[in-house]
Amino acid sequence: MKLKEVLKKLEYNILNGNIEIDIENIQYDSRNIKKNDIFFAIQGYSTDGHKFIESAIEKGAKVIVFDKGFENENMYKDITFIKVKNSRKALAVAASNYYGNPKDKLKLIGVTGTNGKTTSTFMIKSILEEAGFKVGLMGTILNYIGDRKIYAQRTTPESLEIHKLFKDMVDSGVDYCVMEVSSHSLYLDRVYGIEFNEGIFTNLTQDHLDFHKTFENYYNSKLMLFKNSINSVINIDDNYGERILKEIEEKTFTYSIKKYSDLKAESVRLHSRGGEFTVDFKGNKEKINIHIPGEYNVSNALGSILACVNEGISLKVIKRGLEKLSGVPGRCEIVTMGYNLGYDVIVDYAHTPDGLDNVLRTARDFTKGKLISVYGCGGDRDRAKRPIMGRIGTELSDLAILTSDNPRTEEPFSIIDDIVKGVTKDNYIIVQSRREAIKKAMTIAKKDDVIVVAGKGHEDYQILKDKTIHFDEREVIKEIIEELY
């Protein structure tokens, strides 16, 4: 492909070489460079791609795109150097050009918020498929192209991978792509230049302050989605949803369980396996059943319903789509069904104060016996939330078992010490090994008790100081059942 075609719609200065040359592939990781590739030097979270420009050239890069700090271009007469204002934004535009601008051939629905992104995208996918569309999904758990699964490395990939996935979706006949859009991806321009048909806001609570530094920065990152959405679908039960309404001029639609809104849930009834509620949209009423418990999942369903109504899908089709979704991996997932233990074990991804609060309150509503929680906090992440989660877990549980959760480079007991600082009750024990903590809970549990294992959900790994090990809580719980019973 001609370099000038890759650089379409970009403002740039040619410092050396020319743009009439052919290039092979686009790369932002110098380790992947091959002969005649174009290398985009981007600032990463922990390292700066500009440090690897010379390494990329040695490996065969023909073109270097950068935005700062490289002054040796005159040393490389055969290399084309392109200076841009922002190499991350340039990468996003170039990636789209390189893959034939597949984003323009898809209808895109983006979901952002601290919690609820994954569940919402699975709900929307199920509804759209019930309406007869072929659907792609990008998310925390998996990427889907129709029924084909592609395992995800992070919530939102880099822009290069996004546009490659878009192309694969277009080539496979996908009509809609439903995306989890993280605050990182918005701030780091991974979704730069993408216009969404529907942008959905679920909620905003404390998380990622290790990255964003302040809550205001975190909010402003989320806000960016709605400046690039045709329709904005906003949860006004969340105070930040109310604020978004005041700050964006785009077409807005509201949903709520508690307030007057464009779409409101009425007659909400919750139970241990899900819930039911009625929606009324412009005089059309429909009773909806969902198979994921918790009031917060009624809220996730409302956002999904409203976005799909905006896309012209009837409430009857939406009802069928939601009722066909049996659950979402690692989201309030009861993993002991069929074992007849007398108690339930729930696995949930809750790794934020609000997420932990939600899942424990939901479990409490259907717990006849004692509620036991097993959780920790991730290492090298927002330390401020640790004592808050310590307080929430002990206040809402009869017994909290504090343990490890991806400690990364930190000492596990140091993280647990931070959690304990927020504890105001003495109903907790510390079991540093996550497997042993789960086993301890299952040893203690009696008839009608509920155990909530929070923090990892769908994850099948544990990140330690010097390695990542396989750790799937469903498998672990099954092994423990075989050991104990």
Curated annotation (Swiss-Prot):
Modification N6-carboxylysine, positions: K222
Coiled-coil positions: none
GO cellular component: cytoplasm
InterPro entries: Folylpolyglutamate_synth_CS, Mur-like_cat_sf, Mur_ligase_C, Mur_ligase_C_dom_sf, Mur_ligase_cen, Mur_ligase_N, MurE/MurF_N, UDP-N-AcMur-Glu-dNH2Pim_ligase
Positions contributing to ATP binding: G113, T114, N115, G116, K117, T118, T119
Enzyme class name: ligase
Binding site for UDP-N-acetyl-alpha-D-muramoyl-L-alanyl-D-glutamate: S30, T155, T156, S182, R190
UniProt main location, coarse: cytoplasm
Signal sequence annotation: none
Record-linked HAMAP family: MurE
Family: Belongs to the MurCDEF family. MurE subfamily.
Protein name from the UniProt record: UDP-N-acetylmuramoyl-L-alanyl-D-glutamate--2,6-diaminopimelate ligase
